[in-house]
Amino acid sequence: MSRVSIKTRDDLPEALRPLWDKMTTYGAFENQAGVMAHRAPIFKHMWSLLVDLASDGIISKRHLELALVTVSLLNKCDYCVSHHAPKLAVQGVSEEGAARLVDYKDHPELDELDKLVVEYSIAVTNNWNRTRDEIFARLRAHFSEAQIVELTWRIALCGAFNRFNDILQLEVEQGVPHSEAAE
């Protein structure tokens, strides 16, 4: 049970209700949005950013979901794994494959670029202060600087969402298949 109450669309100021409607096209994140709705600036800016990035993203959906699931596995966030593993399945990585992303080096469902995205997600999450230039040279071979910025931001933001969701004990919405992130 969530540690704070979950607000609904009707609890938002009228001006933010269209953003709630757009948010629901991103996925079944009503519990997360409902908690953020306690502070209109948090709801407004986080969901505006996510909706904008979804409509104008420059990272492939596959690479984005690889990054988000990897970070969520590392941080053991059941909420985020439950929401993003199905999106990764749409991109061709099985449920079993998603569960073992952190063991990426010999992962049969990942190509070399996929493995680089997972490796970078681990670096941003666990080794941000010890990451060397070598990985950036490999990233630059495949991604523009704008893409590297977006990928890095999405990885870091996912870590913040993992902590937010877990500390407030957000439950996975009804109808979303529950996935365990714990090893």
Give the ranges of each region predicted by the language model:
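Hydrophobic alpha-helical segments
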Residues: 1-183
